[in-house]
């Protein structure tokens, strides 16, 4: 992710135009446009990761409630005819190399890609970094609250429903919540899907800020691929994915209220910039 991008007004440090603004709730001194110092950003990211790990790996006390919530989600999806998880799970499991690849995709890419996009954003778009990063961190914190107060089991935990735990069946290390390490991880942190939050954030960031068309296309395809993977591996319901998308949207809304500026440039302005030589 090293392509050059022509700076927008925000990237060059100039304040956005005042028309149609929402907020800001924060005073000007708490919403600078320049990127933060690297050591401070690493510390904040480390604290967020520590909170994520602590909450994500805390074994919930209400296992029965988590399973009941999962059964309720599955029943509701059946009523609404959006229960595609079982079909996708079984179809992917029939192709050995595909499902093994999906297991490793599920285990690794949400960390690797998100960190990569954060680094690219910090280096190439310093004027956008704070706003876009704030939306991601806010959405992640909201997801952690969901894990703590709305523990939900993944589809593969629903006995008698026919879901395949693809990590166990294919003997991969595709998830901390399967196999031999399951006792070390919170297996009821399905709602909302952090995979969807992070992949949608990464995809939007690339789609809005990357200059090269193929990078923008990859950004648009990445959350769709992640959505397929989380269903194929029976780690999330469609509802979990929808909740993840809604959580990210709320993260962007909170960021806008706090700073009074959008995280991304307007589509029209971005298109004009991309068309310039």
Feature roles, as predicted:
Residues 104-121, 195-203:
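Hydrophobic alpha-helical transmembrane segments
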Residues 56, 63-72, 84, 122-214, ...:
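Membrane-interface loops
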Residues 51-59, 81, 85, 146, ...:
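Alpha-helical membrane-inserting segments
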Residues 50-54, 140-148, 221-232:
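Aromatic-anchored segments of alpha-helical transmembrane domains
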Residues 36, 40, 44, 130-135, ...:
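Alpha-helical transmembrane segments of integral membrane proteins
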Residues 233, 237-277:
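C-terminal membrane module of polytopic membrane proteins
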Residues 154-161, 186-191, 225-251:
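Interfacial helix-loop-helix junctions of multi-pass membrane proteins
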Residues 2-112:
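N-terminal transmembrane-helix/juxtamembrane module of multi-pass inner/ER membrane proteins
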């Amino acid at each position: 992710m090293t392509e050059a991008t022509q700076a927008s007004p925000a990237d060059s440090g100039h304040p956005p135009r005042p028309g149609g603004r929402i907020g800001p709730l924060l005073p000007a001194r708490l919403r600078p446009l320049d990127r933060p110092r690297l050591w401070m950003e690493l510390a904040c990211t480390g604290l967020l990761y520590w909170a994520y790990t602590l909450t994500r790996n805390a074994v919930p006390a209400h296992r029965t409630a988590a399973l009941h919530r999962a059964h309720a989600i599955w029943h509701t999806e059946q009523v609404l005819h959006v229960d595609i998880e079982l079909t996708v799970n079984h179809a992917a499991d029939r192709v050995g190399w595909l499902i093994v690849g999906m297991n490793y995709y599920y285990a690794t890419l949400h960390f690797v890609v998100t960190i990569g996009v954060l680094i690219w954003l910090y280096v190439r778009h310093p004027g956008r970094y704070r706003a876009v990063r704030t939306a991601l961190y806010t959405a992640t914190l909201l997801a952690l609250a969901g894990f703590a107060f709305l523990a939900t089991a993944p589809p593969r935990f629903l006995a008698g429903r026919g879901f395949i735990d693809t990590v166990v069946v294919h003997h991969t290390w595709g998830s901390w919540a399967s196999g031999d390490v399951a006792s070390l991880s919170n297996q009821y942190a399905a709602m909302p899907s952090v995979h969807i939050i992070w992949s949608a954030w990464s995809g939007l960031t690339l789609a809005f800020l990357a200059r090269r068309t193929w990078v923008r296309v990859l950004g648009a395809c990445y959350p769709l691929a992640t959505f397929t993977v989380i269903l194929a591996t029976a780690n999330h319901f469609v509802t979990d994915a929808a909740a993840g998308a809604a959580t990210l949207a709320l993260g962007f809304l909170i960021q806008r209220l706090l700073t009074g500026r959008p995280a991304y440039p307007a589509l029209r302005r971005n298109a004009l910039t991309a068309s310039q030589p």
